[in-house]
Amino acid sequence: MAAGVAAWLPFARAAAIGWMPVASGPMPAPPRQERKRTQDALIVLNVSGTRFQTWQDTLERYPDTLLGSSERDFFYHPETQQYFFDRDPDIFRHILNFYRTGKLHYPRHECISAYDEELAFFGLIPEIIGDCCYEEYKDRRRENAERLQDDADTDNTGESALPTMTARQRVWRAFENPHTSTMALVFYYVTGFFIAVSVIANVVETVPCGSSPGHIKELPCGERYAVAFFCLDTACVMIFTVEYLLRLAAAPSRYRFVRSVMSIIDVVAILPYYIGLVMTDNEDVSGAFVTLRVFRVFRIFKFSRHSQGLRILGYTLKSCASELGFLLFSLTMAIIIFATVMFYAEKGSSASKFTSIPAAFWYTIVTMTTLGYGDMVPKTIAGKIFGSICSLSGVLVIALPVPVIVSNFSRIYHQNQRADKRRAQKKARLARIRAAKTGSANAYMQSKRNGLLSNQLQSSEDEQAFVSKSGSSFETQHHHLLHCLEKTTNHEFVDEQVFEESCMEVATGNRPSSHSPSLSSQQGVTSTCCSRRHKKTFRIPNANVSGSHRGSVQELSTIQIRCVERTPLSNSRSSLNAKMEECVKLNCEQPYVTTAIISIPTPPVTTPEGDDRPESPEYSGGNIVRVSAL
């Protein structure tokens, strides 16, 4: 070991000064230190085809997670000796790095919902995300939650929910989303018009309109045309009252609606009118009445229901409540500090207007907000110095929260823009689907009128095949099975109605049809998948059938009917071979299935004939089993 180090020492010194000496002989092998890992093993993690390798000790650092516990054995494949996870390999890189470094990072280019799903799958909580990424993660998560909430509200007020809505829900939906119906849109514009009229009237009634007869002093328009303004105010208040009562009646939660900000604004907007009706016109209450009339200006906030920009501003102020609280707290501290300093700095001046600390509040507020009315100015040198410091500190204190408020406003604005775009795309997509359905139906009806469907059926065989395709699949399979049995056995299966018609033709002396009544001879029957078996003819006497067609029907010997929870029934030979009208009707109303075993007597010596139909007009001598549907 020492010899190896001594051999490497000249090369290490040469590398330290930037050059390498020429070796006279081959360099010795570097010293190796065997790494002993008795309990640690190399684990291969296959994530959707991407292989990751790490040590078992690395994963077991966090035993409360999926990879660090024994639960990962559920994903082990003995054939490949790998742990297979059908997850996103890009996000898994950051999860595996958490096991290696102990720090979890949030990839900015990944979807926040997919990232949360991966963390939940592997048993990691978002609170362990590093400080470098946690704030951005919270912002993205909040935006996603708001977007999902907007989508849920849109789906709840969508057109698809109209058939299941009650009248109360329809009214509330019309108020919240006026574009759902024509009447809601008309009421929306009517209320907006009366809000504008009310605000304009509240402003115009204070404008001087000249003096009335008998008065020298000019009167405001509200007093000179009191009747006109009263009627106008009454009409506006009636509209606002009806709107408020309808909203209150249709609100999903009346308690939450009454406590909402917009509900309070509506009450404050209409309450002064009703109080003014019951108040007497005297000097004692005139001051209170004037104070109540001031609250009519709050009607302008009703425009927030009609303006998306005002709603975005309200959402911005609500989301920036913490920043605004910090701004207010900082201004309050600065105002108190600088007002106290300015009072004591100007206390020695006789011409100073800083008579008290509360009186100095006005100067501090005006200075920190950079207004500078000039009604109060410092006279001493110390007062001017502290006034300059107060002005500079005001700029810094006010400017700090402004970027946060602007960024929140921009975020909420773009979020609403995306929501409007998604709603427009969804509406256009539904319109295209509706148009496609209508166009397809119209095209089908037009082609049917033009006879395009009938022209496709060029022959009777094609028409029969078309009818058979449109029939029941069960019936088609049933005929196919009987057809295969007819081909592979020496029996012919005849439809019950065809068999009775053939018997009636023979009984009346008419010449039966030349073709066989079996299913194989009928048109429209599909080809069988089984090969034909050589058929043999049996002649068996039948006492219950007329002599003209006695040899065409095989006699049934006995039938055993096994019923569920009943004793087996046996029918006689005569009843089995009786005519259809003499048979007892089957009871098909029972809830159980009846199993019937038909035994056919052993045929006598066979008389081989041709494989095809016989030349005689009678039916073939093959065994004909009459099949009925149970």
From Swiss-Prot:
GO terms for molecular function: A-type (transient outward) potassium channel activity; metal ion binding; voltage-gated monoatomic ion channel activity involved in regulation of postsynaptic membrane potential; voltage-gated potassium channel activity. Keywords: Cell junction, Cell membrane, Cell projection, Ion channel, Ion transport, Membrane, Metal-binding, Phosphoprotein, Postsynaptic cell membrane, Potassium, Potassium channel, Potassium transport, Synapse, Transmembrane, Transmembrane helix, Transport, Voltage-gated channel, Zinc. Residues 308-321 are annotated as: S4-S5 linker. It catalyses: K(+)(in) = K(+)(out). Zn(2+) binds at H105, C111, C132, C133. K(+) binds at T370, L371, G372, Y373. Residues 1-184, 250-256, 308-321, 404-630 are cytoplasmic. A motif (Selectivity filter) lies at residues 370-375. It is found in: Cell membrane; Cell projection, Dendrite; Synapse; Perikaryon. InterPro entries: BTB/POZ_dom (IPR000210), Ion_trans_dom (IPR005821), K_chnl_volt-dep_Kv (IPR003968), K_chnl_volt-dep_Kv4 (IPR003975), K_chnl_volt-dep_Kv4.2 (IPR004055), K_chnl_volt-dep_Kv4_C (IPR024587), Shal-type_N (IPR021645), SKP1/BTB/POZ_sf (IPR011333). Residues 600-622 are annotated as: Disordered. Disulfide bonds: none annotated. A motif (PDZ-binding) lies at residues 627-630. The modification Phosphothreonine is found at T38, T602, T607. Residues 358-369, 370-377 dip into the membrane without crossing it. Residues 474-630 are annotated as: Important for normal channel activation and inactivation, for interaction with KCNIP2, and probably other family members as well. It holds the Pfam family Shal-type. Phosphorylation in response to MAPK activation is increased in stimulated dendrites. Interaction with KCNIP2 and DPP6 propomtes phosphorylation by PKA at Ser-552. Phosphorylation at Ser-552 has no effect on interaction with KCNIP3, but is required for the regulation of channel activity by KCNIP3. Phosphorylation at Ser-552 leads to KCND2 internalization. Phosphorylated by MAPK in response to signaling via the metabotropic glutamate receptor GRM5. Phosphorylation at Ser-616 is required for the down-regulation of neuronal A-type currents in response to signaling via GRM5. Residues 207-226, 282-287, 346-357, 378-380 are extracellular. The transmembrane segment S4 functions as a voltage-sensor and is characterized by a series of positively charged amino acids at every third position. Channel opening and closing is effected by a conformation change that affects the position and orientation of the voltage-sensor paddle formed by S3 and S4 within the membrane. A transmembrane electric field that is positive inside would push the positively charged S4 segment outwards, thereby opening the pore, while a field that is negative inside would pull the S4 segment inwards and close the pore. The N-terminal cytoplasmic region can mediate N-type inactivation by physically blocking the channel. This probably does not happen in vivo, where the N-terminal region mediates interaction with regulatory subunits, such as KCNIP1 and KCNIP2. The zinc binding sites in the N-terminal domain are important for tetramerization and assembly of a functional channel complex. The channel undergoes closed-state inactivation, where conformation changes lead to inactivation through an intermediate state involving breakdown of its 4-fold symmetry. This is A-type voltage-gated potassium channel KCND2.
